[in-house]
Regions:
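Non-catalytic accessory/interaction domains
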Residues: 79, 107, 112, 130, ...
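Hydrophobic alpha-helical and helix-loop surface patches within well-folded domains
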Residues: 17, 134, 160-161, 166-416
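Acidic/His-enriched low-complexity segments
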Residues: 1-202, 327-328, 343-345, 361, ...
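Structural detector for internal amphipathic alpha-helices that build alpha-solenoid repeat scaffolds
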Residues: 473-477, 499-513, 523, 532-547, ...
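Extended alpha-helical scaffolding segments
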Residues: 667-743, 747
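Short, solvent-exposed loop/turn and secondary-structure capping segments
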Residues: 46-62, 114-117, 144-147, 178-179, ...
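Amphipathic alpha-helical scaffolding segments comprising HEAT/armadillo-like alpha-solenoid repeats
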Residues: 481-491, 513-526, 546-561, 580-594, ...
Length: 764
């Protein structure tokens, strides 16, 4: 360690994960000093850590550095969150810090590099290497520094306001990069306009990594995605872009998390709740309110599931490990709270408040009170009540709602009880909209629930057809409000939101034997504007397949031919195959193999496989080169049931298409297939592949592969040995020749020994 200006060595003390430097004099906060540190990083020597959200914390990762795994491109990438970047460069590794940085990366000329900011120079060296110089001249948090290296192909898209948009992918996905990430520019434009804050950084790049320890990471100007999050072929995106929500989430972080950062992990929700809500905003803009509300409900379900296991404040200072903050409270619950705040103050004030928050905290850190103050400045309201009950308290409302109508007095009375445990959760103050439908009209009322038992009375001239509590479907609460069949049918037909129809669909599912509901479901399956509700209707109707065949079978055929969504069409085809038979349907399944949608092709293939396995085996040969995981699973499943040793090359060929938890499904199907195989060389080769899987850093993949080797290979070949020994013993007693069986036994024993040796090698 030396002082740069004087090049004078200075004393320091290095202990564990920190270095203390004696600067030789006292400096004021206004003075600048320069220090250079020469160091070697050894991340692989660090004690392993991590959490469910980020499974490792050594900061710098060398993936397949020797190239021993032919299915995986060698690469280097980093993961800084929470405080892991100090594993590979000295820094004050704390979210309260802001820093600029530059990095020189020297690599073989064949490699592409990526880091924060801009690539300002590439120097070709005489030894076949090059040195890339990246400069990040805008301040950001240390955990957002990144580096990515590999034989990536850089795909450049149309710039946004002169700022480069680029995607770094493996060669195989170069032609598909714009299909995967192509909405990025539109997202940047949308978020910039919505927030009143133009995208603040120098560029925006996205890179896809193998063996990534999380899902994705919002490194400033250079987001990193795990391959399992977004890799698809262009054709696969016909059935939906699987990474679109994550792409939106990480991009929104560039404002919330990077531009304005949480000052401590206790305030992590400032980063993650907004990124989660960024997904909602994008869905709402791109795909409509139904899509956004459906997406939000899935997030809400995730919170409620974890809330059964624990109850914690959204902002909390008493966590055991900082990674504990990465949970369904910081993300899911936080996103729901942001939505409630939006619905309370209204869109104009909401987005004006976000603009003010970003302006006041740009290139700085913030805590939740800074967010409150921004909203208070814009709205002119004291919002302590809202932030206290949602950010600094546990739990959620549990509401029991009852209504009565007095026709004589023309009075509607609604009684609301807050039944949550008040020793854990607060007594909430809840602004809520109620829509009252009566006499062909809708009357919206806003109420404030403030008491443990609160009664509201409204004058209504006629018996209401429906009282729709929380008409905006924005409240994070468990709600018990009984409704009749007539009310829910009316609600489905008249209330405008996905949540209204989804609530009705839950009732319809429980009362599917009702003839009126059956007729309505037939209509819903065709006409509902949202694909998931149409699919839900099909799933409910499938339980009535036998008694409703004359109506349902032609309806499903119609949906297959006419629905505009490929997933709905695929579900209709799957339901037909599961519930009905007929030559007309067989022709339909074969025709499905010619569709562009892999979802439809896969269902058609599965149908043929279940009805005519020998025909499916013939069809599979022509489909083996299709780059669809849905179809790969279908073909593997068929081979696991009907295949022979001749089908083994297919499993070897497609292995590289799977990563992460997908390898568990691959390994299980592969094991079932190998169980059928009779040739020793096939089984040994398969056991070697499974042994590599069992050496995975992913403990779930590791365990699953070990179990497959033991159950599907060791035990099976032990059974073969036992059977042959029994046959040999019997023939010996009968004084018959056992030469042939002994030869078979020798092969079986040698095969079993090799399997056992491989198994023991991974158990050590």
């Amino acid at each position: 360690v030396e002082e740069i200006i004087t090049e004078k060595s200075i004393t320091y003390k290095y202990e564990n994960d920190s270095i203390k430097i004696d600067l030789g004099k006292e400096y004021t906060s206004k003075e600048t000093y320069y220090v250079t540190i020469e160091y070697i990083s050894k991340p692989n020597e660090l004690k392993a850590g991590g959490s469910n959200a980020i499974t490792d914390d050594k900061g710098l990762y060398f993936i397949n550095p020797t190239g021993a795994d032919e299915d995986k491109m060698p690469q280097i990438w980093t993961q800084g969150e929470t405080q892991s970047n100090s594993a590979w460069f000295p820094t004050i590794d704390n979210p309260t810090e802001k820093m600029t940085n530059e990095i020189y990366i020297t690599v073989d000329e064949k490699y592409t590099t990526l880091s924060n900011g801009l690539l300002v120079n590439t120097q070709k060296n005489t030894d076949g290497t090059k040195t890339d110089h990246w400069v990040m001249d805008l301040p950001h948090a240390p955990y957002l520094v990144m580096m990515g290296i590999g034989e990536f192909k850089k795909v450049t898209d149309e710039p946004w306001n002169g700022k480069e948009i680029s995607y770094y992918v493996e060669k195989e996905y170069e032609q598909h990069a714009k299909a995967i990430f192509g909405k990025t520019k539109k997202m940047i434009e949308f978020y910039s306009n919505k927030l009143g804050t133009p995208y603040p950084w120098q560029k925006y790049a996205q890179i896809v990594a193998r063996d990534y320890v999380s899902g994705a990471m919002e490194n400033t100007t250079a987001t990193l995605h795990g391959d399992f999050v977004c890799y698809q072929t262009t054709r696969e995106t016909i059935d939906g872009a699987k990474g679109e929500g994550t792409i939106a989430h990480e991009l929104f972080h560039q404002w919330f998390g990077d531009y304005a950062s949480c000052e401590s992990w206790s305030n992590l929700t400032l980063n993650e709740s907004f990124a989660t809500y960024g997904e909602y905003l994008w869905e709402e803009f791109e795909n409509g309110r139904d899509a956004a509300d459906n997406h939000s409900a899935e997030s809400r379900f995730g919170y409620f599931a974890q809330a059964q296991q624990k109850q914690v404040d959204l902002v909390r200072f008493d966590y055991n490990e900082r990674e504990d903050m990465f949970d369904a409270f910081s993300y899911n619950k936080g996103g729901q709270i942001i939505h409630m705040l939006r619905k309370y103050v209204g869109d104009d004030a909401f987005f004006a408040s976000l603009k003010l928050y970003l302006e006041k905290n740009k290139f700085k850190t913030a805590e939740v009170h800074d967010l409150r103050l921004a909203f208070e400045e814009v709205t002119g309201q004291d919002l302590n009540w809202f932030f206290n009950e949602w950010y600094f308290a546990k739990g959620h409302p549990e509401l029991e709602i009852k209504k009565t109508y007095d026709g004589t007095l023309k009075k509607l009375t609604i009684t609301i009880n807050q039944n949550q445990d008040l020793t854990v959760a607060p007594l909430y103050k809840l602004p809520v909209f109620i829509d009252i439908y009566a006499d062909g009209k809708k009357d919206r009322k806003q109420i404030w629930i403030e008491d443990a038992k609160h009664t509201f009375t409204f004058t209504v001239d006629k018996q209401p057809d429906l009282v729709n509590f929380d008409a905006e479907r924005q409240l994070l609460a468990k709600i018990d409000f009984a409704k009749t069949k007539q009310e829910l049918v009316f609600q489905y037909k008249n209330a405008p939101l996905w949540g209204d129809r989804d609530e009705a669909m839950s009732f319809f599912s429980e009362h599917a034997n009702d003839s009126d509901i059956q007729s309505l479901l037939m209509e819903i399956a065709v006409t509902d504007p949202w694909k998931n509700i149409r699919s839900q209707a099909i799933a409910i109707l499938a339980t009535l397949a036998k008694e409703k065949e004359s109506e349902l079978k032609p309806l499903l055929v119609r949906i297959y031919h006419e629905d505009k969504n490929t997933r709905v069409r695929a579900l209709a085809l799957k339901t037909l195959a599961l519930k009905y038979k007929g030559d007309d349907l067989n022709a339909l399944y074969e025709q499905a193999l010619n569709e562009q949608s892999y979802a439809i092709v896969s269902e058609g293939f599965d149908a043929i496989a279940s009805l005519n396995p020998s025909l499916a085996m013939k069809k599979a040969t022509a489909l083996e080169n299709e780059a669809s995981k849905d179809l790969m699973y279908s073909i593997m499943d068929l081979y696991a049931k009907q295949g022979t040793d001749d089908n083994h090359p297919y499993f070897i060929k497609i292995k590289k298409q799977f990563s992460g938890f997908e390898l568990m499904s691959y390994g299980n199907l592969y094991g079932k297939f190998l169980k059928r195989c009779t040739k020793s060389e096939t089984v040994i080769d398969g056991a070697k592949v499974l042994t590599k899987l069992a050496s995975s850093d992913n403990k779930y993949v590791k365990y699953a592969a070990q179990k497959v080797i033991k159950d599907n290979l060791m035990n099976v070949w032990q059974g073969k040995e036992d059977k042959l020994n029994g046959q040999i013993d019997k023939l010996k007693k009968e004084n018959q020749d056992v030469t042939t069986l002994n030869a078979e036994l020798k092969v079986v024993q040698e095969t079993k020994k090799q399997i056992v040796d491989l198994y023991n090698s991974i158990k050590k």
